[in-house]
Amino acid sequence: MSQHVETKLAQIGNRSDEVTGTVSAPIYLSTAYRHRGIGESTGFDYVRTKNPTRQLVEDAIANLENGARGLAFSSGMAAIQTIMALFKSGDELIVSSDLYGGTYRLFENEWKKYGLTFHYDDFSDEDCLRSKITPNTKAVFVETPTNPLMQEADIEHIARITKEHGLLLIVDNTFYTPVLQRPLELGADIVIHSATKYLGGHNDLLAGLVVVKDERLGEEMFQHQNAIGAVLPPFDSWLLMRGMKTLSLRMRQHQANAQELAAFLEEQEEISDVLYPGKGGMLSFRLQKEEWVNPFLKALKTICFAESLGGVESFITYPATQTHMDIPEEIRIANGVCNRLLRFSVGIEHAEDLKEDLKQALCQVKEGAVSFE
């Protein structure tokens, strides 16, 4: 029976133990599992390879994304690192130009050393994308919407091109989650989540998830996961399951607030522009003057100046010195991540309270009431 995403989320782990009938999934902390004899495994041998609690999370995300197999990692970057093990020296990937700084750092500072080449594209021009495809191209890696400029890519359109050329299509779905977007249904082969963000939702765990479209690729990814070993621990797996149960409710409030806050910010004369695709809980905006950035951040009382996103609390991040600091300044600014840009992870607080906080901070900055030091 096909179920709605809200039901899938609420039911995660609820029938995991038929012996006791426990509703809340157990946390299996054991690192090893007893065998009755040679070749008589229970299916669980060693915690790095497989763990019952982690298995529930992996099955849940595969079910939510309608994929063949899910895999849980110790962080979003560990998930991407393990995906990169699919490639070898000489391979080329085409990647979103407006990319999370941590992913850019991994590609440019780590994987280039092993002979991989990365070409950057905003995926707005089909001819431009096609021109970057060479005989060595193996995959296209897309963030949609991008971090932090909130640019959406047409996954279906890109998928038609990747299939035409026999390329893998990898999509980072962190910002939209399976509630708002399911890339495998649109033609992607691999989906990534930094589950630290919306899926966990409470700023209290570090996790990454991957879902693959077919079992063959899933088995290959599992072998890399087992070999590299950056797996999600049992307790963090349980925390993630607990957070995911309320994902749909939280995303609804994140989105409602973000829509209201985006409209509010567009009316403020201290703001030059607002970047919001119309859905989801993430937006970015630029202040009129660079020198206003630090005083504005200092003046906030409810909204937290912090480097993360997707939690129930509202966060504002300064990409230039936080998430994107490892991208060379000339490249960062050319891509649109200027020194006036702020990224806003809109929480689930009352929208009027968030407006009041923004309003008083902007007012203080404009009137010079906050120290510029």
UniProtKB/Swiss-Prot annotation:
Gene3D superfamilies per UniProt: Aspartate Aminotransferase, domain 1 (3.90.1150.10), Type I PLP-dependent aspartate aminotransferase-like (Major domain) (3.40.640.10)
Major place of residence: cytoplasm
GO molecular function, one term: O-acetylhomoserine sulfhydrylase activity
EC numbers: 2.5.1.-
Keyword Amino-acid biosynthesis carried by entry: yes
Subunit structure: Homotetramer.
Record-given protein name: Cystathionine gamma-synthase/O-acetylhomoserine (thiol)-lyase
